[in-house]
Amino acid sequence: MDKGSTKVKLLSLENEIIEVDEEVAKKSQLIKNMIEDTGTEDDIPIPNVKKEILLKILEYCEKHKNDNPPEIEKPLTTSNLSELVDPYDAKFIDIENLEQLFEIILAANYLDIKSLLDLACAKVATLIKNKTPDEIRKTFNIPNDFTPEEEAQIREENKWAEEATS
């Protein structure tokens, strides 16, 4: 039997089975370790990841099953991710739904898929880059719980940081 055609069954948060090529699943260090420890006969539980997110992540793993994406240069030199990564990766992570993006970050971290975690975090960084605190709050729907006096005090205490970036 061809090693590349061995299938593994992943069990999502909703207890739904997703069948995938072993080599694709092994892009996750967590799954790779589980396969090495227990084999591929039993379902592999992925209790922290919804089926929808797991399918999206497996799409990424399928694309990169035969390669390792290059490191994303840090700090980011632009807020245009397509200038920093492969066009497929830029399109893949161009997610409008921030909740889904954060679920991918959590799942990539849990599954130990460093290249996807870096990509998703870089996407978040592009949403923050060159924005004011008010713009960042608006983007991420974060309430401002500082009084104007507290904000003024914080700005004064951190004036050196603003001067360093000007």
Curated annotation (Swiss-Prot):
Signal peptide: none annotated. Keywords: Ubl conjugation pathway. Disruption phenotype: Increased telomere length. It holds the Pfam family Skp1. CDD domains: BTB_POZ_SKP1. Gene3D superfamilies: Potassium Channel Kv1.1, Chain A. Pathway: Protein modification; protein ubiquitination. SUPFAM superfamilies: POZ domain, Skp1 dimerisation domain-like. It comes from the Eukaryota. InterPro entries: SKP1 (IPR016897), SKP1-like (IPR001232), SKP1-like_dim_sf (IPR036296), SKP1/BTB/POZ_sf (IPR011333), Skp1_comp_dimer (IPR016072), Skp1_comp_POZ (IPR016073). GO terms for biological process: protein ubiquitination; ubiquitin-dependent protein catabolic process. Residues 105-166 are annotated as: Interaction with the F-box domain of F-box proteins. SMART domains: Skp1. Belongs to the SKP1 family. Essential component of the SCF (SKP1-CUL1-F-box protein) ubiquitin ligase complex, which mediates the ubiquitination of proteins involved in cell cycle progression, signal transduction and transcription. In the SCF complex, serves as an adapter that links the F-box protein to CUL1. The functional specificity of the SCF complex depends on the F-box protein as substrate recognition component. Its association with the holoenzyme telomerase ribonucleoprotein complex suggests that it may play a role in turnover of holoenzyme telomerase complex components. Component of multiple SCF (SKP1-CUL1-F-box) E3 ubiquitin-protein ligase complexes formed of CUL1, SKP1, RBX1 and a variable F-box domain-containing protein as substrate-specific subunit. This is S-phase kinase-associated protein 1 homolog. It comes from Tetrahymena thermophila (strain SB210).
